[in-house]
């Protein structure tokens, strides 16, 4: 029996019609092979012979697959027909071809065989008989004998079935698809006619031109010769007087007009049928093209588009060319239809183009038609010109409006980026430039210029002569940096973006790389606002000596720690960092060389010296040096003054040193502090507390971060949780804006409570401030209900050395906790009316002040880094009892000299009855009566500062808010 699946057949009995059938084998998997239709004679022979012995049949209608007889077909054989040929079984039963599934019908006709027609037309007699025999359920009796030729043909066909066809044979069997000729316009007669007409028209035009030239020469000769014949003169004047009206009616003019119209129509005709002409030429060269051809019309349009896009003056040149062509063609037409000269005709053509009303004076049909045509073209040309001019003006104005023009400035301050600190930063820069009559600040950000100007216009302060210029662009693109004259700026400030810390610092690093790539170099230094302290070394490594970094997030955290331990310090920092009052300045005074620092300290009536920039140590700034330090040549003095031109050294005043009060060393007491929220740099804040607090202190951390996650984050930050010696960490989980969660905490027992801007909502300053204010109100309300039943704190808090009424007023009988709330938006702080100074709302305004100060003088960054660090010198608040006695009369210079015995520099004071501290007071030599309720602001060494901070803990009254919640 034959197995025809997959294009193979196994003959039995040597290919004869007789023999015992082979044992049945399971059908092989069908193979995806192409089919080939066998000729009708072979198929009919197979039908006549193969039905006699179905088990030994090997021939099929298609060489790749043989249909099994109905009796021998295995049951369950899946067969799917592509189509329904005329010779298929009507019921689609066992006689259905099992090869037809290989090629789906929805893919179109098979390349190797034509699809059989669906119509029920009669095939030839032999084919119909064979199909009828194959469809009959009862096999017909086979012939007794078979001719030798038939057997040979059957063997050859069997060999074809068994042997897989090669690729070349399959290609030969597949008829080529019929060529589909695209419909085209036959240009042969039209092209010949067009060429003939063109040649004739051109010849007639030349002949007419020559004839008109000869006629003009005759007219000129008639006008110049006095003996000319009267008749000739009359005819000449007649021709000139009629302005060509007789010439219009002549056959010559008609031929010239027709030829001119045909000449103008030729380009239009070529543009319309150029593709058909090109296709005809290519078809004559090659009959069949395998590559896709682009029409010439599209090619021309593409070239024109590239030309207009790549050349800035392409539109203007095209308009100029069109105008020249219009004037030239119009001049030629006027020259033909009128009796004027060629140059005169060109001039008339130009006047018709320039002014559409000039053609009204023309006489005669020909000149009028030509003049109207020229005027119409002129109106089109001028309309196009107006459109181009309007587009150019609009594009230029739009470029100015969008901030794409170049900034031509020198010694300006350049701000790269946009953030919520920009408003307060511009305010501080405007105040700093007030003394010089104002300056220029350029802002480059990836925002629309109009939006930036609108936001800056909403700021409620006067710029005092400082102009702010906004430009839209990316700080990462060198072209945009050159647009704002980055190489000529005296200072560049890179603001942190509103993204998370790592993304913001990564962007700042890319901006620094862009700045270092400026070929012209940078004249000023670069101040970079960083978000994470760990990324600071990388930025400094890339930028080099020009880079000054201000780690905003860490600065806020450390300031909050200092303000929690010393309430009132935030206001003092605002006075020093802001340009409205006193600030840091560094300047060299040669007349002070050789003087001791103790004498330099009292040499400035309008400033307070607090450090020295040592020239011999590569410009290192030494804060709070010893009294015996002698200024060398090149050393500069660091002072706190109103402005850089408001102080000069003077002669030494007379001071009374007196005796320093003998205050016993107070003991240090443990503190209990609560952190509400989670910050990225909370590990740094914990280390600052570890350095400041006494042993046995507790730090409660209340937030929504799981305890294991907290330990992991603290460990990743580089902190040894089990290595803390002074503080003990207490973890509590909860939401700081849910009252039920807050009531589970002993809020009345905490000495200080810090409400942190939560890390989960720090990207939105509005949400962060809302959470902070809600937490502050809830804590105050819970404390007010619990504190009356609470006993007073230990009398150790009220030892004899703390007599300030300002401090006693904040300590109060109920001993309320100090609450420091972190507010990111300065506008939110304006909604809160703070009672006294304890519950101070800290905002990003301090960071903006630090950025502005470092931008004005990069050396100040060394001072701020030391004052913000947990080591070195820091700013503190001291009670007057450490420097004077009750009602003692002293000058400010006397107190400065006494403070030197404690290695401190007094920079200001606050009287008992005042709400504002005075930094760098005037009239320092004036003697006044002091009270023990007064306090002084000093710069002290880290050891002394930590010691005295613990003895002057301040407490506050309840906070009063002006807004209603």
From Swiss-Prot:
Inactivation phenotype: Defective in mycorrhizal symbiosis.
Membrane protein topology class: Multi-pass membrane protein
Tissue expression profile of the protein: Expressed in roots, leaves, stems and panicles.
GO biological process: monoatomic ion transmembrane transport
Pfam family, one: Castor_Poll_mid
Localization in the cell: Nucleus membrane
GO-annotated cellular components: nuclear membrane
Protein name listed in UniProt: Probable ion channel POLLUX
Species annotation: Oryza sativa subsp. japonica
């Amino acid at each position: 029996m034959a197995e025809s699946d997959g294009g193979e057949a196994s003959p039995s009995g040597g290919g004869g019609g007789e023999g015992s059938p082979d044992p049945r084998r399971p059908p092989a998997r069908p193979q995806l092979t192409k089919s080939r239709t066998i000729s009708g004679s072979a198929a009919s022979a197979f039908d006549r012979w193969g039905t006699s012995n179905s088990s030994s049949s090997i021939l099929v209608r298609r060489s790749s697959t043989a249909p099994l007889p109905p009796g021998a077909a295995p049951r369950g054989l899946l067969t799917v027909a592509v189509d329904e040929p005329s010779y298929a079984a009507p019921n689609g039963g066992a006689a259905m071809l099992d090869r037809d599934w290989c090629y789906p019908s929805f893919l179109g006709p098979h390349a190797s065989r034509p699809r059989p027609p669906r119509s029920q037309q009669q095939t030839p007699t032999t084919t119909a008989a064979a199909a009828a025999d194959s469809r009959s359920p009862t096999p017909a009796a086979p012939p007794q004998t078979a001719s030798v030729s038939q057997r040979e043909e059957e063997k050859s066909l069997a060999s074809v079935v068994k042997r897989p066809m090669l690729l070349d044979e399959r290609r030969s069997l597949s008829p080529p698809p019929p060529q589909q000729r695209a419909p085209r316009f036959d240009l042969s007669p039209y092209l010949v006619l067009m060429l003939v007409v063109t040649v004739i028209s051109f010849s007639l035009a030349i002949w007419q031109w020559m004839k008109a030239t000869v006629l003009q020469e005759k007219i000129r000769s008639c006008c110049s010769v006095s003996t000319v014949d009267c008749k000739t003169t009359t005819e000449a004047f007649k021709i000139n007087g009629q302005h060509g009206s007789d010439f219009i009616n002549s056959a010559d003019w008609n031929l010239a007009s027709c030829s001119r119209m045909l000449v103008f129509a030729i380009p239009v005709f070529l543009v319309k049928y150029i593709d058909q002409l090109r296709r005809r030429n290519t078809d004559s060269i090659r009959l069949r093209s395998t590559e896709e051809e682009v029409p010439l019309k599209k090619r021309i349009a593409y070239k024109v588009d590239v030309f207009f896009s790549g050349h800035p003056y392409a539109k203007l040149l095209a308009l100029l060319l069109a105008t020249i062509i219009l004037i030239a063609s119009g001049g030629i037409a006027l020259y033909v239809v009128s009796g004027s000269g060629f140059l005169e005709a060109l001039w008339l053509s130009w006047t018709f183009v320039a002014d559409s009303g000039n053609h009204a004076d023309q006489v005669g049909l020909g000149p009028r038609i030509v003049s109207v045509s020229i005027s119409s073209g002129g109106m089109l040309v001028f309309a196009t010109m107006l459109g181009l001019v309007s587009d150019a003006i609009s594009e230029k104005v739009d470029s100015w409006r969008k901030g794409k023009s170049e900034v031509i400035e020198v010694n300006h301050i350049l701000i790269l980026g946009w953030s919520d600190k920009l408003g307060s930063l511009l305010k501080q820069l405007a105040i700093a430039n007030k003394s010089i009559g104002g300056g220029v600040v350029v802002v480059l950000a990836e925002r629309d210029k109009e939006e930036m100007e609108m936001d800056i216009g909403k700021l409620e302060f006067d710029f005092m002569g400082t102009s702010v210029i906004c430009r839209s662009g990316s700080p990462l693109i060198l072209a945009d940096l050159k647009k704002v004259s980055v190489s000529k700026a005296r200072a560049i400030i890179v603001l942190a973006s509103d993204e998370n810390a790592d993304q913001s610092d990564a962007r700042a690093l890319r901006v620094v790389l862009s700045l270092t790539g400026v070929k012209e170099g940078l004249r000023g230094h670069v101040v970079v606002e960083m978000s994470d302290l760990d990324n600071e070394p990388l930025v400094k490594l890339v930028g080099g000596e020009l880079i000054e970094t201000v780690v905003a997030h860490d600065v806020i955290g450390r300031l909050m720690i200092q303000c929690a331990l010393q309430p009132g310090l935030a206001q003092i920092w605002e006075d020093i960092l802001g340009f409205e009052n006193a600030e840091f300045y560094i300047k060299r005074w040669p007349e002070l060389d050789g003087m001791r620092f103790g004498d330099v300290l009292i040499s400035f009536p309008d400033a307070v010296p607090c450090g020295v920039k040592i020239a011999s140590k590569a410009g290192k700034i030494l804060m709070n040096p010893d009294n015996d330090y002698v200024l060398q040549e090149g050393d500069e003095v660091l002072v706190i003054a109103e402005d850089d031109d408001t102080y000069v050294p003077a002669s030494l005043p007379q001071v009374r040193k007196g005796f320093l009060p003998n205050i016993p060393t107070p003991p240090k007491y443990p503190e209990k502090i609560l952190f509400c929220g989670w910050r990225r740099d909370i590990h740094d804040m914990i280390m600052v507390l570890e350095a400041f607090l006494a042993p046995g202190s507790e730090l409660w951390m209340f937030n929504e971060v799981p305890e294991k996650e907290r330990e992991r984050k603290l460990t990743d930050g580089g902190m040894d949780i089990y290595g803390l010696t002074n503080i003990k960490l207490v973890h509590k989980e909860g939401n700081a804006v849910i009252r039920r969660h807050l009531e589970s905490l002993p809020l009345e027992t905490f000495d200080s409570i810090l409400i942190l801007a939560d890390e989960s909502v720090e990207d939105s300053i509005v949400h962060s401030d809302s959470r902070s204010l809600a937490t502050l109100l809830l804590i105050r309300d819970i404390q007010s209900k619990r504190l009356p039943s609470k006993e007073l704190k230990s009398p150790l808090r009220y030892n004899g050395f703390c007599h300030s009424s300002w401090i006693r007023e904040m300590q109060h009988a109920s001993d309320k906790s100090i609450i420091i709330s972190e507010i990111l938006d300065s506008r939110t702080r304006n909604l809160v009316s703070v009672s006294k100074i304890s519950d101070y709302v800290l905002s990003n305004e301090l960071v903006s002040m630090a950025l502005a100060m470092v931008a004005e003088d990069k050396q100040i960054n060394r001072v701020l880094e030391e004052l913000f660090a947990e080591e070195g010198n820091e700013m503190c608040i001291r009670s007057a009892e450490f420097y004077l006695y009750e009602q003692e009369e002293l000058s400010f210079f006397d107190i400065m000299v006494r403070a030197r015995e404690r290695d401190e520099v007094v920079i200001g004071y606050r009287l008992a009855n005042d709400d504002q501290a005075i930094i760098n007071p005037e009239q320092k030599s004036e003697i006044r009566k002091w009270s023990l309720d007064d306090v002084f602001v000093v710069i002290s060494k880290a050891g002394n500062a930590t010691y005295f901070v613990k003895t002057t803990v301040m407490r506050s009254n309840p906070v009063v808010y002006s807004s209603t919640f």
